[in-house]
């Protein structure tokens, strides 16, 4: 038999300029329908990737590992970033947007970016115009607290923006006293100041659970609950504790995670819900009235009624709920973890320092951005745990295998073990006996939602028994 050959397609007759023109029309149409139309109604959000520089040097941080890939130093020029941000603000108001602006960046609140960025936003939004965000969200490592001058400036900024109807909401990326070894070491005095500051402004915390620090997390969680109780900050006890979704998880570290979430689940059942099984079940199934002000909870069964309707998008900024824009070049990507040149969707153009239109560079990632669902991913679509899985990190998947849509095996092992463990634990506690009590029988969507939940739970339990 002769060698098999892959047919080579002759593209000599294709008008590439026409193809690019059509792709640009398509991309601009998609952006308008899937993002801009929502932004005008205050829905979804824009994620501003301002700077890729951070001095914290956290052991698990992707910016530490992949900074030059995701935000090359050569494109992060101060004057360019500031001019592009000014053009972005003009475009935001001219487009009649009112959605959340989310700053996802390195450590910038102690740099010269801070005053310039906030001054530009204040000048743009201080009028009574409706075209401004109600919330500006800033995840930050809160190291500015150690600098008295910077700390006072941030306090001033918060009050200044509150006076024009904008809540600057900060999320504290601080792991805690017993997990400081992989990050910046902080003093007890620092933590007291941090929590008083967060309490004053109703800020929450999003410490990370990594394969390296998970061994310390039971003691770390106790510390968080104790210090938040000491400061009488009950609202702050809803700490995020998101797992670092990378390939470093081993069988040993996964076992340590299971011990940790077992401890947290018991603690919440005993202390937060006073052993009320129905209320606890409503919380772990993310029933709206129980989780109104909560964030990701690593002891809940991550679930959304949207899954029943085929809207099972990955639960991070890679979903169609967020449009990321990098200020160094006004480009957009699927998310801040996938800003590799070959995956960058395209960039906004400027004429006379005004954003004019959008030019697509890679149309494929745009389709992934608006349409990729867990139920379509290889290795995920037939998984019985899919309805309870928060999903993997596309950026990490790409770095491991060059396949955006295939979860790295260690991450898959992590969530299979965790989800199976939680479902079995809650079943053994008798929580699922109360599912029917949560259902409003007159609400067709609720009936469908909880019926589907029961089916998924029973499938998982049957697989565990098998």
Predicted feature residues:
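Short, small/polar residue-rich loop motifs at catalytic or cofactor-binding pockets
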Residues: 315-321
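Short Fe-S-cluster ligation motifs
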Residues: 85-105, 407-456
